[in-house]
Amino acid sequence: MDQRLDPGLSPYRTFTRAEWAQLREDTPMTLGAEEILRLQGLNDRLSIREVEEIYLPLSRLLSMYVGATQKLFRAMSQFLDHRNNAEGKMPYIIGVAGSVAVGKSTTARVLQALLARWPHTPKVDLVTTDGFLLPNAVLQREGLMEKKGFPESYDLSLLLRFLTDIKAGRRPVKAPLYSHFFYDVLPDQMVEVDRPDILIVEGLNVLQTGRPPRDGKAIPFVSDFFDFSVYIDADEDVLEHWYVQRFMRLRETAFKDPLSYFHRYSKLTEEEARETALSIWHRINLTNLRENILPTRQRANLILRKAGDHEVAEVQLRKL
């Protein structure tokens, strides 16, 4: 029997960049050139054209999704006689997933900026799952420092409790803060999330699930709390190149600070630094991508596929 999948059976509809750009229609551009520059991540590229052709159509799509979800929630509240939520509001949660160095943070920040300009969703918060990593002291004790960013390196129960409280409409809900400068969770430092209209959750493994239990008991996954999810995709060799580029730039900037966790790398020669970056990529990040991140790609509602120039070349939207 031929096991090849008929393209017509794919759960996704694929758009070229030009086809996707046409879906913007009359969605207004609400970001200026200076703001776009501020939203751009280190070693990422974000242009006005990218916002117009990729993110404005996505903004329009999400506007429809959020509106439909809010309408359904109001109908359910009436059906249940408003017993579930006294204020008639439930945050819409968007997950953003993808590899290290793919540009997740830039995408999340652009979406936050665009969605916050909708008249019906003025409050949009952004939380990264980095804050839910186990502290370095715990990772070292458990022998997991080489697995940082892998599923087992997160305080999953804390993350699930955070998302449960958000969906339940509790206020305010606190999330731990992470410092890339110190490469650790910041003790006793939290960010408050106070009943946003939309919450964007960005992280490596946010779409991951596990094996269902044999006893049939319900086990929640992070993605169970998402109303919509985006996966940022790129080829492995492209991701490797971007990661090394970013490492080399950090070597000349943040790593030079004596207080930086990675200060030792600033003293390497250029060749030594490049070899170190490649070693970290292959030993940790590529392994995590292949074993844990990439297998979750097909669980996303939308896949943004990037080319080597950091621009989105193709969009895949899950069929309803």
Swiss-Prot record:
Question: This protein's superkingdom?
Answer: Bacteria
What molecular functions are annotated in GO for this chain? ATP binding; pantothenate kinase activity
Q: Does the keyword Metal-binding apply?
A: no
The record's annotation in Pfam families points to: PRK
- Give GO BP annotations, semicolon-separated: coenzyme A biosynthetic process
Q: Where in the cell is it found?
A: Cytoplasm
Has the keyword Nucleotide-binding been applied to this entry? yes
Q: Which UniProt keywords apply?
A: ATP-binding, Coenzyme A biosynthesis, Cytoplasm, Kinase, Nucleotide-binding, Transferase
Q: What is its EC number?
A: 2.7.1.33
The biological pathway it contributes to is: Cofactor biosynthesis; coenzyme A biosynthesis; CoA from (R)-pantothenate: step 1/5
Class of this enzyme: transferase
CC annotations in GO: cytoplasm
| InterPro entries reported in the protein's UniProt record | P-loop_NTPase (IPR027417), PanK (IPR004566), PRK/URK (IPR006083)
Q: Which reaction does it catalyse?
A: (R)-pantothenate + ATP = (R)-4'-phosphopantothenate + ADP + H(+)
Entry binding sites for ATP = G98, S99, V100, A101, V102, G103, K104, S105
Q: Which protein family is it in?
A: Belongs to the prokaryotic pantothenate kinase family.
Q: Which NCBIfam families match?
A: panK_bact
Q: Name it.
A: Pantothenate kinase
From which source organism is this entry?
Azorhizobium caulinodans (strain ATCC 43989 / DSM 5975 / JCM 20966 / LMG 6465 / NBRC 14845 / NCIMB 13405 / ORS 571)
